[in-house]
Curated annotation (Swiss-Prot):
Belongs to the ATP:guanido phosphotransferase family. Appears to be allosterically activated by the binding of pArg-containing polypeptides to the pArg-binding pocket localized in the C-terminal domain of McsB. Keywords: Allosteric enzyme, ATP-binding, Kinase, Nucleotide-binding, Transferase. Transmembrane segments: none annotated. This is Protein-arginine kinase. Changing H92A: Loss of protein kinase activity. InterPro entries: Arg_Kinase, ATP-guanido_PTrfase, ATP-guanido_PTrfase_AS, ATP-guanido_PTrfase_cat, Gln_synth/guanido_kin_cat_dom. The lineage of its organism: Bacteria, Bacillati, Bacillota, Bacilli, Bacillales. A motif (RDXXRA motif of the pArg binding pocket involved in allosteric regulation) lies at residues 338-343. It is an enzyme of class 2 (transferase). The gene is mcsB. One of its GO terms (cellular component) is extracellular space.
């Protein structure tokens, strides 16, 4: 396997698949925080200990195939260019913290990019499993099986009373973070999102932007995750989040239908104006691109736009990020240069998709 595929392919294999409710839920993620006995936490350990942790996982797992995921590749942060690290963040394969603040960090990646094991982030390892659509239970099962497999080769820091020990007290217990990425344009347009977010927070869940803590909800994409890890089982945490997500899906669908009834041609006009901008613009920044892509995605889901597939929108949401634009350019770009390249890339990708659809219809 070539490292290049991780940096040059925008859409991971799992992202190109349709999952349950994938018109609204882009992805489901389970993340497990674990630490190894006899080593200090990453917040306290020495550079030598950090290197020992990486070496431990390299020896134990790099050449050991794991089921359908196959072999893992080890990517060391110290050996990657800043642009390459940014690409991995944009694909949700590593966290911004690992990319920016972990000089001795690393990541084990499966070939299909469904599994990512971050090493020396806030904890010794963070196991991540990503699934398309609303598949929290399936992602939990996959993460738990992987967790058991890893535990067969290393000894976890575990307390009979507290559970899994972690650097941050908010992760102690199960060490589990379950999250879903949701596209909620109708709840934003109707401003219902302003009352929904505080209500979700009161239920012990947290709402963040596209790239987690501190990030903006670009393109009306929100990340919903659990906050409590202690005193509940993994299954209960996931079930509670699943229930809330199903309610959000129902509210978003109802809001979409209400917009169709109340706005009618104005909503259709908004969608096609955004499509027109994407198909013809010469300069576009990431924020405007994300908003237009959101409008077009809504138009596809409502049946207004028929010559573009939802998968192309998923691809463009990542391709148009600063890291990917610079990776394709082969070097650092100034913001204004990125805006020109972003516009050209979107125009060309939409042209290719329209041509492909037309050729398919003629057959």
């Amino acid at each position: 396997m070539s490292f290049g595929k991780f940096f040059n392919t925008a859409v991971s294999a799992w992202m190109s698949q349709e999952g349950p409710n994938s018109d609204i839920v882009l992805s489901s993620r389970i993340r497990l925080a674990r630490n190894i006995v006899d080593f200090r936490f990453p917040t306290l350990f020495s550079s030598e200990e950090a290197k020992q942790i990486v070496a431990l996982f390299e020896r134990a797992f790099v050449h050991r195939p794991y089921g359908e995921a196959g072999r893992f590749e080890l990517l060391k942060m110290s050996e990657l260019q800043p642009i390459e690290k940014r690409v991995l963040v944009e694909k949700h394969l590593i966290s911004p913290h690992l990319a920016e603040d972990s000089p001795f960090g690393a990541c084990l990646l499966s070939e299909n990019e469904e599994i990512s094991i971050m090493i020396n982030e806030e904890d010794h390892i963070r196991i991540q499993c990503l699934f398309p659509g609303l598949q929290l239970a399936e992602a939990l099962e996959a993460a738990s099986e992987l967790d058991d497999w890893i535990e067969g080769h290393v000894n976890y820091a575990f307390d009979e009373r507290l559970g899994y020990l972690t650097s941050c007290p908010t992760n102690v217990g199960t060490g589990l973070r379950a999250s879903v990425m949701m596209h909620l344009p109708a709840l934003v347009l109707t401003q219902q999102i302003n009352r929904i977010i505080p209500a979700i927070n009161q239920l012990g869940l947290v709402v963040r932007g596209t790239y987690g803590e501190g990030s903006e909800a670009l393109g009306n994409i929100f990340q919903i995750s659990n906050q409590i890890t202690l005193g509940k089982s993994e299954e209960d945490i996931v079930a509670d989040l699943h229930t809330i997500v199903e309610q959000l899906i129902a509210q978003e669908r109802a809001a979409r239908q209400a917009l169709v009834k109340t706005l009618g041609i104005q909503l259709e006009d908004k969608v096609f104006r955004s499509y027109g901008i994407l198909a013809n613009c010469r300069v576009i920044d990431s924020k405007e691109a994300a908003q237009c892509l959101s409008d077009v995605r809504l138009g596809i889901d409502l049946g207004y736009i028929k010559n573009v597939s939802r998968n192309i929108l998923n691809e463009l949401m990542i391709l148009t990020q600063p890291g990917f634009l610079q990776q394709y350019a082969g070097g650092v770009l100034r913001p204004e240069e990125r805006d020109v390249r972003r516009a050209a890339l979107i125009r060309e990708r939409l042209r290719m998709e329209t041509r492909r659809k037309m050729e398919g219809d003629e057959r």
